């Protein structure tokens, strides 16, 4: 018996990440090859983006995806999020030349307050929300705080791109297959302050930390490479990393929906106070997923170097939260 279609809302649907994302959702890569989807696509109420969205929908039609049960174009989050089972909040205001971070936070604050309120009003009560648009952790925090009638656990931020970048660097360093890396995590903010942590990681049961055994490489090569990878891609490509961000969003949502079989992944989730992270802070943590729920990996030892890195990324996040407090 075929499954009932689920509703997937995507914001910024005509943008670069949206374009790299929608065809993969419609083909079944995110929710499984037996799960029909209805795409509810949101773009800003401006002629250019709305017209571009129509073009993307024409292409989606032309793929004749068996799992694409329907799609709709929207310019208002109140209609785009109606009964949504999944919401990928991709659209955000990028930082323009000469724009101060505070200004960026304020502009995005307004966007994510409105979207949080709309989700609160019309989305499924079990909606799974992933914020991709930067600053992702703080935008997710704003959306969560603007949706008091939805469970906090429904809101997540994307740290998976940092996680995948870290895995790829470790695979290159060790000469091993990226698929064999387990128990890797990224703590904190999706920003250059994030802390990619391979102290517990294994490859085919062997310790990655022992394999690499080079703290100087960790502190001076690995962490800066992962932290500044986005900037390096803009420098090389002239555009930001869209396909790899879309891929990370698919990974994050697929694992959350379908489970990780006991494997660790990284998700930005609202803290309940574990590891000394204040409650409600949207923070990257190691989690496992099953039955549509994520579960924090608890009881990991935090050494002095790790604590210093975690404190640094937390401090940045708390500064961002303070910068949007007046909006909430």
From Swiss-Prot:
Catalytic activity: (S)-malate + NAD(+) = oxaloacetate + NADH + H(+)
Residue numbers annotated as active site: 190 (proton acceptor)
Species annotation: Polaromonas sp. (strain JS666 / ATCC BAA-500)
Pfam families: Ldh_1_C, Ldh_1_N
Xref: InterPro entries: L-lactate/malate_DH, Lactate/malate_DH_C, Lactate/malate_DH_N, Lactate_DH/Glyco_Ohase_4_C, Malate_DH_type2, NAD(P)-bd_dom_sf
Record-listed NAD(+) binding positions: 12-18, 108, 115, 132-134
NCBIfam families to which the protein is assigned, alphabetical: MalateDH-SF1, PRK05442.1
Function: Catalyzes the reversible oxidation of malate to oxaloacetate.
Keyword terms of this UniProt record: NAD, Oxidoreductase, Tricarboxylic acid cycle
Protein name: Malate dehydrogenase
Record flagged with keyword Signal: no
SUPFAM superfamilies per record: LDH C-terminal domain-like, NAD(P)-binding Rossmann-fold domains
Residue positions binding substrate: 95, 101, 134, 165
Family membership: Belongs to the LDH/MDH superfamily. MDH type 2 family.
Molecular-function GO term, any one: L-malate dehydrogenase (NAD+) activity
Keyword Mitochondrion: no
One GO-annotated biological process of the protein: tricarboxylic acid cycle
């Amino acid at each position: 018996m075929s499954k009932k279609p689920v509703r997937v809302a995507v914001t910024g649907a005509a943008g670069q990440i949206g374009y790299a994302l929608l065809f993969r959702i419609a083909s079944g890569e995110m929710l499984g090859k037996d799960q029909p989807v209805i795409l509810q696509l949101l773009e800003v109420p401006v002629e250019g983006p709305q017209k571009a969205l129509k073009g993307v929908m024409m292409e989606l039609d032309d793929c004749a995806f068996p799992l694409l049960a329907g799609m709709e174009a929207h310019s208002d989050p109140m209609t785009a999020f109606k009964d949504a089972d999944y919401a990928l909040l991709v659209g955000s205001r990028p930082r323009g030349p000469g724009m101060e971070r505070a200004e960026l936070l304020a502009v995005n604050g307004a966007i994510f307050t409105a979207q949080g309120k709309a989700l609160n009003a019309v989305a499924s009560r079990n909606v799974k929300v992933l914020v991709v648009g930067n600053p992702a952790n703080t935008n997710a925090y704003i959306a969560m705080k603007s949706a008091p009638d939805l469970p906090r656990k429904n809101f997540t931020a994307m740290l998976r791109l940092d996680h995948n970048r870290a895995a790829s660097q470790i695979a290159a360093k060790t000469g091993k297959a990226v698929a064999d890396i387990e128990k890797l995590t990224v703590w904190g903010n999706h920003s250059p302050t994030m802390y990619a942590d391979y102290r517990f990681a294994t490859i085919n049961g062997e310790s990655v930390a022992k394999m690499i055994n080079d703290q100087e490489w960790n502190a001076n090569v690995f962490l800066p490479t992962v932290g500044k990878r986005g900037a390096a891609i803009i420098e090389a490509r002239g555009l930001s990393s869209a396909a790899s961000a879309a891929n990370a969003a698919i990974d994050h949502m697929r694992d959350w929906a379908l489970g990780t079989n006991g494997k660790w992944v990284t998700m930005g989730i609202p803290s309940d106070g574990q590891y000394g992270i204040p409650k409600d802070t949207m923070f990257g943590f190691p989690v496992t997923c099953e039955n549509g729920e994520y579960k924090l990996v608890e009881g990991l030892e935090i050494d002095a170097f790790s604590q210093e890195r975690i404190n640094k990324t937390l401090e940045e996040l708390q500064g961002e939260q303070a910068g949007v407090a007046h909006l909430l």
